[in-house]
Amino acid sequence: MLFGRLTERAQRVLAHAQEEAIRLNHSNIGTEHLLLGLMKEPEGIAAKVLESFNITEDKVIEEVEKLIGHGQDHVGTLHYTPRAKKVIELSMDEARKLHHNFVGTEHILLGLIRENEGVAARVFANLDLNITKARAQVVKALGNPEMSNKNAQASKSNNTPTLDSLARDLTVIAKDGTLDPVIGRDKEITRVIEVLSRRTKNNPVLIGEPGVGKTAIAEGLAQAIVNNEVPETLKDKRVMSLDMGTVVAGTKYRGEFEERLKKVMEEIQQAGNVILFIDELHTLVGAGGAEGAIDASNILKPALARGELQCIGATTLDEYRKNIEKDAALERRFQPVQVDEPSVVDTVAILKGLRDRYEAHHRINISDEAIEAAVKLSNRYVSDRFLPDKAIDLIDEASSKVRLKSHTTPNNLKEIEQEIEKVKNEKDAAVHAQEFENAANLRDKQTKLEKQYEEAKNEWKNTQNGMSTSLSEEDIAEVIAGWTGIPLTKINETESEKLLSLEDTLHERVIGQKDAVNSISKAVRRARAGLKDPKRPIGSFIFLGPTGVGKTELARALAESMFGDDDAMIRVDMSEFMEKHAVSRLVGAPPGYVGHDDGGQLTEKVRRKPYSVILFDEIEKAHPDVFNILLQVLDDGHLTDTKGRTVDFRNTIIIMTSNVGAQELQDQRFAGFGGSSDGQDYETIRKTMLKELKNSFRPEFLNRVDDIIVFHKLTKEELKEIVTMMVNKLTNRLSEQNINIIVTDKAKDKIAEEGYDPEYGARPLIRAIQKTIEDNLSELILDGNQIEGKKVTVDHDGKEFKYDIAEQTSETKTPSQA
């Protein structure tokens, strides 16, 4: 807060406010203490105005003590509450509107009147202060009618009327104290001052990525000029921010734009104390240059070269390269000042400097922990934007969320409101029906409810005023989780249980394959507990095994357990990448080729969903060179698409499936399933498949994968479990048509026997169920048999499948086992 702009009496008011907070044993200085401070200065305009409304110091003290009472013994430094900070800001705004250079007690009172949510506002309400009349009385006591900023500014700068209508005076705004403080940019501001002090070509251009604080440096220069922290050459200069869109707007006829811009240049040259700031400098190129007319950049070039016009530009690296560097004559007139992204430490300092402004706006307390969490989490998880902009946005949105959450009307008040509305409608209906006795009863009920509502509302407001809302790390994590979809909030008990039992959840869909399920589950738990390497994906796996043992199904089951839907994973079928050039489909077509603007199938999906399961199915079908592009994904967790954007893979689980080596196993008569030859050696199968994998893929690719898992052979018992699972799916589908189907154990055993194939794994079971159950049921339905609403029992008598159709009963009877 700018205490240097306070009058002596206003400074004493703040000192009295601090004393009152100490007297009442309160830990913060709030609006009520500011009001008590005003009453302690009886000679001030504020106290005199309040006395004219019969509000005395004793009454205010009594009301404050009644509303919030005395606190416990307080030890430590007193801080202003966000509402008190807001009042000081509003008082400065009032002083500016009244064209006063200093803030007095009267402005603080006007600020208290405008802040309608603090304890002071409730004191005014309880003492029946008419806010409108009080404000008018203050203005009358000052003997100074309010004028608009616009009129004041015009009266101060009559020598540049065109410029004033098209540009904002940053020095005036800085003098008013409404610009945010600029922290940690001393080096860049010094370099700008050095360039501005040159004799010719004294035009700095601030170049940097979006959101690193280029515009803030121009504002920092304006603040330095106001605070006399600049050399003699720049003292009393005005920094005017010119928007090229405003200059072009309304120029209907040819020559109007050039005339307007020339007039601005003449005014700047005559004034001699104007530094022009053009944000988005690249808009100069081509502005107003329709139908062969001269554009803005060519009009400004001569004045820029001679030093007659001082201009600060700001633009991004890409726009500077595309627009400014392309025009060498324009480029040489500007001196580039590189604005780099601040470090994490610098960003924390910047946010701490801005904290007062955001606390005053949102009326909450922002802790140091929340600031540090905002910087670290945004730096780690929001990779396509830059500090400090993304961290500031995170603090702003999280503060807004907390503020809205804490000030939402509670349910009990809403219920009473609805009840009042209902009773009111009933009363009106009774009056229309001329049931006056009933209407009188309803009126009494309405009055009682309204009184109850007021009491509940006052109680809620008291609770709100006594409670200091704070922004915590958890609030920051919630917002960034909403931005990115990555779960960052603290693990609650339910989620903890879910993660610890992830193996059981996956085994509900994937029968057997304990090693694969355990590896995947451990990787997910490591990531959620915050122990994974922050520079690599959550996990990368290669699943090996013959066809039909559950490799792809495990990836689907993982996607369902994490996102609630097995279609939520990003699936890339590698059989579509048999040609070498097909790799462009992953990262996007090169410049000049069709589809360059569409982006890559993989990179675009991961940019939209950075927290996902990525399945590369049947990797041995793809061209070997395709996998070179995955090397940096597996090692560093990022991939650059054809537009130069870095896509973050650090929050993905990468699963690759392969049947490599299955043919050789078949030749060796190792089918990969339990059957007649139960003595097959899993280690022999594993070694054979890994050997084939090493022959098919490069060592630098395999070395980057976290785990290579060879899936186990499926036993007969596991095949029976799979049959049961498939039958349950069929039962669910038929239940939608109101058909109840029961499949006996004998029928299931026969299906498992018919569907078992050592070469094709578990997939033939699907065909066996289609052949034995679905085909016959479909014929029964189409033959005109009314089986809807009935119970169908499927059994096997040792020779063929039997279908028994019966009426459904309340008791489910077990079918006879023949």
Swiss-Prot record:
The keyword ATP-binding applies. Keywords: ATP-binding, Chaperone, Nucleotide-binding, Repeat, Stress response. Residues 6-71 are annotated as: Repeat 1. One of its GO terms (cellular component) is cytoplasm. GO terms for molecular function: ATP binding; ATP hydrolysis activity. The keyword S-adenosyl-L-methionine does not apply. Residues 417-452 form the UVR domain. SMART domains: AAA, ClpB_D2-small. Disulfide bonds: none annotated. Residues 80-144 are annotated as: Repeat 2. Residues 163-410 are annotated as: I. This is ATP-dependent Clp protease ATP-binding subunit ClpC. It comes from Staphylococcus aureus (strain bovine RF122 / ET3-1).
